[in-house]
A protein has these predicted regions:
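N-terminal glycine-/serine-/threonine-rich beta1-alpha1-beta2 phosphate-ribose binding loop
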Residues: 1-134, 143-158
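A contiguous active-site-proximal alpha/beta segment in oxidoreductase catalytic domains
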Residues: 131, 138-216
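Conserved S-adenosyl-L-methionine
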Residues: 269-274
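Mid-domain beta-loop-alpha active-site segment that forms a flexible
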Residues: 52-53, 162-170, 193-267
Length: 298
């Protein structure tokens, strides 16, 4: 599979020359999202987001899940069991998303993959005539975002990014109260995120976990050897091969709400103050003890 750089270069040139051929079947032309006709969907990426995404999709009675796709065997197994428990039905299992792109009967794909797959997967889905629900962030980098927009304008497919707080009733109510002036004039917004997630493991070479297709996981990214516990969530933090750090993980939510509350457009400039801080040992660090007459702060 080509790496991300060659993918962007090739597809940008192709769009400029309008060289793509529509691969829509007559059946696909007759399907309109939102109609009463059955809509065949596929899930790509069957990890942490699947419980919410699957339940949300199945709330619509005309939805039929055609495929459950993931590069890890046990993810497919768990999602298959979940789907059967919810519906009493089964869906086709697939590791390679390209086979789903080729299926003309699939109308839309719900993508919940690692970040580096987002723009590439969405563009290939649109090229094959499919609508896309895309988990945040919509791309791995700004160049891919521009490319994604070009694809959407050319293929005229529905692409929805999953910024769920935008559609949360609680958030919408809060934004309306701020707009109505219930807290006065807003002049500053502070975005933050707390989590009790465990420390990120140090990267060490390791064997590819059983059931994982490491080549397909890497997809459009550069090729490298597997390092411990990369595939399951920690891909977010290791360099920029697959993830976008907390900027793409949670800041995409929190900064969006902060900007929404202020009623402003995009910033003129961004200042970042950050550090690469990690612990290489579990030994106690130096600390300060304060004696408060029998009570202590350490």
């Amino acid at each position: 599979m080509k790496n991300r750089r060659s993918f962007i270069k090739k597809t940008t040139l192709s769009l400029a020359g309008i060289t793509f051929l529509n691969s829509f079947s007559a059946k696909s032309y007759r399907k309109i999202i939102g109609s009463n006709e059955r809509i065949n969907i596929a899930f790509q990426g069957l990890g942490r987001r699947i419980p919410g995404l699957m339940s949300g999709a199945l709330a619509y009675k005309n939805i039929e899940v055609s495929y459950l796709c993931d590069v890890m065997d046990n993810q497919v197994k768990k999602a298959t069991e979940r789907y059967f428990n919810l519906t009493g039905k089964t869906a086709k299992s697939e590791k390679n998303i390209h086979r789903i792109f080729e299926d003309k009967d699939v109308d839309a794909i719900i993508m919940a993959t690692p970040d580096h797959w987002h723009a590439y997967g969405a563009c290939k889905a649109m090229e094959s005539g499919k609508h896309v629900y895309l988990e945040k962030p919509c791309s791995h980098n700004m160049n891919e975002s521009d490319l994604l927009l070009d694809y959407q304008k050319y293929f005229k497919k529905v692409v929805q990014m999953g910024n769920q707080q935008r559609s949360s009733p609680h958030t919408i109510e809060l934004m309306q109260k701020i707009k109505d002036g219930e807290i006065g004039k807003t002049y500053k917004s502070t975005a933050f995120y707390h989590s009790n997630r465990p420390r990120v493991p140090n990267q060490v070479l390791a064997s590819v976990p059983q059931g994982l297709n490491w080549n397909l996981f890497q997809g459009p990214a550069v090729r490298r050897e597997y390092t411990y516990d990369t595939w399951d969530y920690n891909w977010r933090w290791y360099d920029w091969d697959y993830g976008t750090g907390e900027a793409g993980n949670n800041a995409t939510h929190e900064l969006d709400i902060a900007r929404w509350a202020l009623g402003v457009d995009y910033p003129h400039k961004v200042d970042v103050y950050a550090g690469c801080l990690l612990y290489t040992s579990d030994a106690a660090d130096e600390g300060l003890g304060v004696d408060l007459g029998g009570r202590r702060i350490i």
